[in-house]
């Protein structure tokens, strides 16, 4: 089971899935908030809980992958995760226990912004942290940040940092990552993710 990273989708595995499928059944899925999946309103921990909102967090994404493995795959599974998908793969493997054959991490997210790692931050970042957290909770600000990031030129710049060789950073990949940013709810998924400060 292939688990994508932040801002990505199942199609991000377009080359890997084809190769892996030639030797074993291979699945890639869109995590809630990404790709073609639903993008419900974000539920930040201090906000009133409603059934329409979603708490974008590693536990919930891991539960999604766990349920997928149990209901669709129905056999022992190898989990492969990229970036935040790596964190989700690790959490899912704990839930699956013996049904997890193993985990492969590709450029696993370090979660350096997590509150548990605050002591590792510079003095300036520790001082600014409460201010940053207050600002990114505001929908107006998070929507504006999202609107800046949800552009093909910005996506291309990020891809070139992530893939310095530039191999496979093509129009198809850029469009694959750009298209979901135009769907209803995408700014809410972004808001939910950028507010993950205590979740691993």
Task: Explain the meaning of each model-derived region.
Residues 3-5, 82:
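The conserved beta1-alpha1 loop
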Residues 11-14, 31-80:
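Active-site loop/oxyanion-hole signature of alpha/beta-hydrolase fold enzymes
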Residues 139-200:
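Conserved alpha/beta-hydrolase catalytic His-Asp/Glu region
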